[in-house]
Amino acid sequence: LIADRARSKILLALASGRELSASVLADEAGISRSTASAHLRKLADGGLIAARNDGRNRHFRIAGPEVAGVLERLMELAPPEPITSLRGSTRAAQLRRARTCYDHLAGRLGVGIMHSMLQRGYLAGGDGLFAPEQAVDDHPAGHGRDLDYRVTDAGDAFLEQIGVRVPDSRRPLVRYCIDWTETRHHLAGRLGRGIRDRFLEAGWVKRSATHRALKVTPAGETILEREFGLVLQP
């Protein structure tokens, strides 16, 4: 189902966690609207995406974090797609620097934030590194299961200080993924979503129009250096 190139491009566009229209997804996949409709129907029937009617329009979203995790895993395993344009090269660099992984931050940004919180004692339970020779259930680009990270008292105070509100749900508070570009841990779970939401709400990062890349704003660069000791390289 996801081996088809057009369908995989549709899924990757939706992996940001946002809802997108069929026309936007057709443009992302480089196919016609009618062809996109057929692919979207197959993905919905397969339980990988969900649709919402908005008047005469339909918007689509990824079915859940588990699907996004599978996509990250496949991206790590798949051979890199040849970059044949400046636009493609720029997008690849942007994704490595800062992107969303479903509803949390990934790339150098996500990995750097988690590393900083571990170094400063805001998180405990591991070192943020992926050691394949020691891993039992952890795999690149998948949800981590080997370690049990937790927020410390100092971490609770820090999160309150920078305005992070953790959403209520039955999802675990702290989860982690093995980042597919950095091969280190980034935060997921409710905490990962709360941090992403705060960065977007405060204007520290801005979304791309369609794909998962994020742009760190000047205000975001300041916060990262001041609160996390993190200088994000281009």
Regions found by a protein language model. Give the residues of each.
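Beta-hairpin "wing" of winged helix-turn-helix
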Residues: A44-D54, R58-R61, G126-D127, S208-A209
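N-terminal helix-turn-helix DNA-binding core of bacterial DNA-binding proteins
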Residues: L1-S32, R58-F60, T100-C101
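Accessory beta->alpha helical hairpin/"wing" motif in late/C-terminal subdomains of nucleic-acid enzymes
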Residues: F60-A63, D127-E160, A209-E227
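Short helix-coil-helix linker/hinge
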Residues: L1-R7, G64-P65, L95, G107
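Basic, amphipathic "hinge/linker" alpha-helix immediately C-terminal to the N-terminal HTH DNA-binding motif
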Residues: E19, D54-A78, V151-G155, G220
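Canonical helix-turn-helix DNA-binding module
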Residues: A22-I49
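Short alpha-helical elements of helix-turn-helix
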Residues: I2-L11, S37, A68, V111
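Amphipathic alpha-helical dimerization/coiled-coil segments
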Residues: S16, G69-G128, F158-G194, L200-A202, ...
